[in-house]
Amino acid sequence: MRERFDRFLHEKNCMTDLLAKLEAKTGVNRSFIALGVIGLVALYLVFGYGASLLCNLIGFGYPAYISMKAIESPNKDDDTQWLTYWVVYGVFSIAEFFSDLFLSWLPFYYMLKCGFLLWCMAPSPANGAEMLYRRIIRPIFLRHESQVDSVVKDVKDKAKETADAISKEVKKATVNLLGDVKKST
């Protein structure tokens, strides 16, 4: 685990470049710097004001950036990985909406939530998002796919009917308004 962490800290990216500069200036090993930052973030998630914002930035910011890079890359495997993350993130967000009133009062909630989101986005083929999707979300989706498709089609048809009716009324009102303007001139 430590070797993987060290390898990760020596990959070429903007974060590791910053760690390398800090390591060179301070003489402190980048592993210790990274662990210190992780510790400070964890403490902030427990005690800090705006912990929910920080947690949501971590759960959204990095995955959004990497998702855009995945879309622009020719490799499609990373697209699937990040689409899976976003499906799990969406399901989690909906579940959290209904339980947030209770969960946000728990000590360590935002640290646990952040840990959960980091586990879901972990750079491994068997990360949390993949496991949750494969074991929970996908079976439920496949079991109810036809009913959901039917509801989506009905809603889409009703929305189209409503949009057409509104468009027709707007056209009629425009014609009447233009007729009234023409009569008054």
UniProtKB/Swiss-Prot annotation:
Disrupted gene: phenotype observed: RNAi-mediated knockdown in the heart of P10 neonatal mice causes lethal cardiac dysfunction at 4 weeks. Myocardium is disorganized with greater fibrotic regions with significant collagen deposition in the ventricular myocardium. Mice show significant myocardial dilatation and cardiac contractile dysfunction. Also, sarcomere organization is disordered and the sarcoplasmic reticulum membrane forms vacuoles. Myocardium has elevated expression levels of ER stress marker Hspa5/Grp78, cleaved Casp12, Rtn4, Atl3 and Ckap4.
Membrane-crossing residue ranges in chain numbering: 31-47, 50-70, 81-99, 102-119
GO biological process: endoplasmic reticulum membrane organization
Any matching Pfam family: TB2_DP1_HVA22
Topological domain ranges for the Cytoplasmic compartment: 1-30, 71-80, 120-185
Keyword Isomerase applies: no
Compartments, as annotated in UniProt: Endoplasmic reticulum membrane; Sarcoplasmic reticulum membrane
Lumenal domain ranges by topology: 48-49, 100-101
UniProt region (Required for dimerization and maintaining endoplasmic reticulum morphology), positions on chain: 110-181
Entry text on domains: The short lumenal loops between transmembrane domains 1 and 2 and between transmembrane domains 3 and 4 may impart a wedge-like configuration, thus deforming membranes.
Family: Belongs to the DP1 family.
Protein name, as recorded: Receptor expression-enhancing protein 5
Protein encoded by which gene: Reep5
